[in-house]
């Protein structure tokens, strides 16, 4: 076959498969995956080296990391979540891509990649920014979720319209095979529209508003797309065999529950468990659910939850203004 024929054949293949070819190789893409961007301090316990950085400066930090680059880091607060998300991938279907976003340089970041290799985590893509904010790479990778220990980085990602959370220290580890993720509702899955009414007018005004708007779907919040991506993976399995289980854990109670249920129905998104707690502390309920991770917009709720499960603060909405 001549060169012209080979070019035509490649064009036919690209047309049939939706892939572009360059020199006979398919062009890599993340478009069909759930993309999780995670900082090195969320994935591993870097508390000792971070203390050196804050107390002694960047030069001492760089020396420490290089001197200890063969020492394996202990798992961090989001390690179990990442491990379980990567476990969703199958030989015939790669659902999840995890991206490392680190303020290390590539040189000092070698210890992180040595630890990734040690634990057998399938993470091959990374951005090392040498002290600069990592959040600018969240859109570039098409991330559905960004987890970091840096609140300002998280806020920037949220401002750009991406699901993001500041991880809290936690010793909780759920070693079951099933991935269990819990979400607060207002300002997380949903917008903070209803929360603003509560903050300005109190519980009675909030209840009146939600009863009157019960059949009006709530606008989406920053975690809607991430929840939808999880639901898309769930839809590949029979309900009783899904490797993912989700829960809505909200301070709402009746009658404010109806609008939430109808909103999820309009979105065609399945939530496996819904806990309407009417203001009760969420920690024990999250422990009972067995959450691998919980997302909430109110810091006090996250601090309480972190005593029982791994948790992240979503600094978004009226409660964080």
How does the language model describe each region?
Residues 8-9:
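Leucine-biased recognition of intrinsically disordered, low-complexity hydrophobic segments
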Residues 25-34, 153-212, 224-225, 283, ...:
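Asp-based, Mg2+/Mn2+-dependent phosphohydrolase catalytic module
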Residues 66, 96, 108-155, 165-171, ...:
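A cross-kingdom feature marking solvent-exposed beta-strand/loop segments within repeated
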Residues 26-132, 175, 184-276:
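Alpha-helical substrate-recognition element adjacent to the catalytic core
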Residues 40, 102, 148, 250, ...:
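Short beta-strand/turn micro-motifs composed of small residues
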Residues 14-17:
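Short linear motifs in low-complexity or flexible loops
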């Amino acid at each position: 076959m001549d060169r012209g024929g080979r070019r035509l054949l490649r064009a036919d293949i690209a047309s049939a498969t939706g892939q572009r070819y360059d020199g006979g190789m398919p062009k890599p893409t993340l478009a069909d995956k759930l993309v999780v961007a995670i900082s090195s301090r969320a994935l591993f316990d870097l508390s000792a080296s971070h203390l050196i950085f804050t107390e002694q400066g960047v030069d001492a930090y760089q020396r420490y990391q290089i001197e200890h680059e063969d020492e394996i880091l202990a798992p961090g607060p989001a390690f179990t979540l990442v491990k379980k998300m990567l476990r969703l991938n199958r030989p015939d279907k790669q659902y999840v891509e995890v991206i490392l976003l680190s303020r290390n340089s590539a040189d000092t970041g070698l210890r992180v990649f040595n630890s990734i290799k040690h634990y057998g985590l399938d993470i091959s893509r990374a951005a090392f920014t040498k002290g600069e904010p990592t959040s600018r790479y969240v859109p570039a990778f098409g991330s559905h979720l960004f987890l970091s220990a840096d609140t300002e980085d998280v806020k920037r990602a949220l401002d750009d319209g991406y699901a993001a959370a500041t991880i809290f220290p936690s010793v909780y580890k759920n070693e079951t095979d099933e991935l269990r993720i819990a979400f607060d509702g207002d300002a997380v899955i949903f917008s903070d529209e209803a929360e603003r009414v509560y903050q300005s007018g109190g519980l009675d005004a909030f209840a009146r508003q939600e009863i009157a708007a019960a059949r009006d779907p709530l606008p989406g919040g920053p975690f809607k797309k991430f929840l939808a991506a999880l639901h898309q993976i769930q839809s590949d399995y029979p309900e009783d065999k899904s490797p993912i289980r989700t829960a809505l854990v909200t301070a709402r109670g009746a009658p404010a529950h109806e609008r939430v249920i109808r909103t999820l129905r309009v979105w065609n998104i399945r939530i496996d468990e819904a806990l309407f707690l009417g203001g009760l502390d969420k920690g024990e309920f999250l422990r009972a659910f067995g959450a691998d991770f919980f997302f909430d917009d109110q810091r006090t709720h996250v601090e309480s939850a972190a005593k029982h499960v791994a948790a992240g603060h979503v600094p978004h909405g009226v409660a964080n203004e």
